[in-house]
């Protein structure tokens, strides 16, 4: 692994089930994540994904690439355009920094972007530790 290495893109179909299940699993009962009418009343065209679901998808993207022994040490994300049902979010990432980690592991800083039909849904960085 080297700085500049790109992770392969991951396309995530944004379904109503994913949005609602992610909200319920993270105990986020805000109506905008499960009630389309309430979301419309608050100015959104439909329900939208919460940050905890996005955070989980970003973590999955990184660990799927680096393997089951990879450990996420820090996830720092910022949301932008909402993820609505029927869209697709494409996650992309680039290794920005690589350093020696504890006990012979390698620590990498990965820059992440998740884009959908409206623009950038998520941007941020993930620090991941990978055994050699």
Report residues per predicted region.
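Hydrophobic residues in beta-strands and at strand termini
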Residues: 14, 79, 128-130
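HotDog/MaoC-like acyl-thioester-processing domains
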Residues: 1-7, 85-132
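Hydrophobic residues on conserved beta-strands that form the core of alpha/beta folds
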Residues: 9, 72-74, 123
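N-terminal hydrophobic or amphipathic segments with adjacent small-residue motifs
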Residues: 37, 45, 50-53, 80, ...
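Mid-chain, well-packed structural core segment of small domains
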Residues: 62-91
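Hot-dog-fold acyl-thioester-processing enzymes
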Residues: 1-70
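Residues that form or immediately flank small-molecule/cofactor binding pockets and catalytic motifs
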Residues: 12, 82, 100
């Amino acid at each position: 692994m080297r700085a500049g290495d790109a992770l392969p893109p991951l396309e995530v179909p944004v379904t109503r089930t994913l949005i609602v299940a992610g909200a319920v699993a993270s105990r986020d009962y805000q109506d905008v994540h499960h009630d389309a009418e309430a979301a419309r009343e608050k100015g959104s065209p439909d329900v939208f994904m919460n940050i905890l679901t996005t955070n989980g998808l970003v973590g999955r993207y990184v660990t799927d690439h680096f393997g089951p022994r990879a450990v996420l040490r820090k996830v720092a994300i910022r949301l932008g355009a909402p993820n609505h049902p029927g869209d697709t979010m494409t996650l992309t990432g680039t290794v920005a920094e690589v350093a020696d980690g504890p006990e012979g592991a390698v620590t990498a800083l990965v820059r992440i972007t998740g884009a959908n039909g409206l623009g950038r849904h998520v941007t941020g960085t993930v620090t991941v530790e990978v055994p050699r």
